[in-house]
């Protein structure tokens, strides 16, 4: 591979990067080398990212049966078992190839009446950590037993494929993004977990009526702990079963497209849950299957496991996941969660006080290469796809086209904006707010870097924090939100609530995001069921009736 001889456009345009031109070239060359390797092995990046079409359950027309495949290079022995063989752990042995892929074949003549849609199964893995029952990494559906609370993989093969009814939604035609951040499980007013079907029937019309043109779905991939907000993923190819079936999620997306709404997935590739029973941690019995070995594979701040982005099989797994959700579920793009944690070995817990911070030994070059590949893949497979980076560090080139030497995201989250508003509300009386300071913070971005502006998201609504409405009006919201009341705190709070949003949406960026319910000043906080609150759903829901009853000022 020849070294870059021309000056990258990103460096040409930005004098600040010219002293680190060699490092910028090296970063881009790593991506180009990887693309060349993929081209030689698979022809194209789109064809390369087909792990979900090879691993897991795959039908073989020639042999008339099902293959089950799983990458477990460190395993000594692997069996598959389930209700189709009366849960006999060591009856159906899988066979290992030179690449560490274990497989078993299920002839239709023998298993047609036993291996049925909805069958439950696991793999029995003998690794360095002994014999364990595990869920395959490529499982497309995982369900929890109501009584034991144990998670089990489910063979998912509906009699008829989902009918998309000609869905060919193009997110590039909807104009400037107005994003409604939503969590399906907590979107209903009742205390409990909401469903995809309820969201489709009740919430999508609200989003459309309020003028948004995109919905960003949180907690899509399966996660064992509901209170993690979906950020401790266990099964990357399985939509959360607590909200319904894969087909019901597809119908949600199809209906959103009918309404003119793009659907963006909150994609978590920064880490994964450390649980052995539910997740992919040590799936083959080693500590370095999907993670770097030892402490390097542990995210101490989130108590979770890290991905080894430099390992080819891990890149293939994650890239296949990027394509999978676009292909199988028609998502229109991604908000990549935790990008700062991904691209730095210190996970961003430093002060970014010099240019060298973006190029020193603290940078994870493999993660940058992976993210560049992920953006290239998303846009090659779906040219209208939208990618958004959650990065607080300001890594150069994050939202610059790959061809120019950038990483290729379409947008970055304007994370300094909510921090600014919180600081103002906590420290500065509103009559002393400085309009010039507001303007400076709202417009502090490079002209070519598109920003998703937001005054608050789910982060600010969590227990221990406060929404803007609650900071402004606090306990008065409990007593004086009826239209008959006159209260200066409520009047002033509502006016500032609107002004903050007006300032943010009009000057903060090229797109705007709001978390569900915050648009009408939803009171209190989000607190998922946990032991500390008696496993209550009282604060894990949205009280839409507050804005609908006509007697309260939320409407």
What annotation goes with each model-predicted range?
Residues 1-63, 67, 88-89, 96-181, ...:
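The feature marks proteins involved in alpha-glucan
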Residues 89-101, 410-412, 418-420:
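Short, acidic Ser/Thr/Gly-rich low-complexity loop/linker segments typical of extracellular
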Residues 547-555:
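Short, intrinsically disordered, charge-balanced linker/junction segments flanking boundaries
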Residues 330-332, 350-542:
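Conserved alpha/beta catalytic core and glycan-binding cleft of carbohydrate-active enzymes
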Residues 71-78:
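Short proline/glycine-enriched turn/loop motifs at strand-loop junctions of beta-rich domains
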Residues 143, 160-161, 165-179, 183-363:
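Substrate-binding/active-site clefts of carbohydrate-active enzymes
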Residues 78-80, 121:
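Short beta-strand elements bearing conserved aromatic residues within extracellular beta-rich modules
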């Amino acid at each position: 591979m020849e070294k870059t001889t021309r000056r990258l456009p990103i460096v040409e345009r930005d004098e600040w990067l010219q002293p680190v031109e060699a490092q910028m070239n090296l970063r881009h060359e790593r991506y180009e080398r990887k693309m060349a390797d993929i081209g030689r092995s698979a022809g194209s990046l789109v064809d390369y990212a087909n792990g979900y079409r090879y691993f897991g359950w795959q039908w073989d027309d020639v042999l008339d049966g099902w293959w089950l495949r799983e990458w477990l290079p460190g395993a000594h022995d692997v069996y598959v078992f389930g209700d189709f063989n009366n849960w006999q752990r060591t009856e159906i042995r899988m066979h290992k190839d030179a690449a560490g892929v274990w497989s078993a074949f299920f002839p239709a003549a023998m298993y047609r009446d036993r291996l049925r849609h909805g069958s439950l199964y696991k793999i029995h893995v003998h690794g360095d950590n002994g014999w364990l029952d595990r869920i395959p990494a490529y499982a497309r559906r995982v369900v929890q037993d109501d009584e034991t609370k144990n998670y089990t993989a489910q063979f998912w093969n509906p009699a008829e494929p989902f009918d998309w009814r000609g869905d060919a939604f193009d997110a590039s035609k909807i104009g400037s993004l107005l994003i409604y951040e939503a969590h399906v499980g907590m979107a209903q007013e009742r205390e409990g977990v909401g469903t995809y079907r309820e969201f489709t029937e009740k919430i999508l019309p609200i989003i459309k009526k309020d003028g948004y043109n995109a919905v960003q779905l949180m907690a899509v991939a399966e996660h064992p702990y509901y209170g993690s907000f979906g950020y401790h993923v266990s099964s990357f190819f399985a939509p959360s079963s607590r909200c319904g079936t894969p087909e019901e999620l597809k119908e949600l997306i199809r209906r959103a497209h009918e309404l003119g709404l793009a659907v963006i997935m909150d994609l978590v590739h920064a880490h994964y849950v450390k649980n052995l029973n539910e997740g992919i941690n040590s799936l083959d019995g080693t500590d370095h299957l999907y993670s770097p070995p030892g402490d390097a594979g542990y995210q101490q701040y989130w108590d979770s496991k890290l991905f080894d982005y430099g390992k080819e099989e891990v890149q293939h797994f994650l890239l296949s996941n990027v394509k999978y959700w676009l292909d199988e579920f028609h998502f229109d793009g991604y908000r990549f969660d935790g990008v700062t944690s991904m691209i730095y070995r210190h996970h961003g817990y430093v002060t970014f006080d010099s240019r060298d911070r973006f190029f020193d030994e603290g940078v994870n070059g493999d993660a940058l290469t992976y993210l560049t590949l992920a953006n290239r893949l998303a846009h090659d497979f779906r040219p209208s796809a939208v990618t958004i980076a959650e990065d607080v560090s300001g890594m150069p080139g994050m939202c610059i086209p790959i061809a120019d030497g950038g990483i290729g995201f379409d947008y970055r989250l304007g994370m300094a904006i909510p921090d600014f508003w919180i600081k103002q509300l906590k420290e500065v009386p509103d009559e002393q707010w400085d309009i010039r300071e507001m303007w400076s913070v709202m417009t502090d971005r490079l002209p070519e870097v598109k920003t998703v502006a937001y005054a608050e998201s789910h982060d600010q609504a969590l227990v221990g924090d406060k929404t803007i409405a609650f900071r402004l009006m606090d306990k008065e919201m409990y007593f004086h939100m009826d239209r008959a009341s006159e209260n200066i705190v409520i009047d002033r709070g509502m006016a500032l609530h609107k002004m903050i949003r007006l300032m943010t949406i009009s000057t903060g960026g090229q797109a705007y995001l709001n978390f569900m319910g915050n648009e009408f000043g939803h009171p209190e906080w989000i607190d998922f069921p946990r032991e500390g609150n008696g496993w209550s759903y009282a604060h894990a829901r949205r009280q839409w009736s507050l804005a609908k009853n006509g007697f309260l000022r939320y409407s």
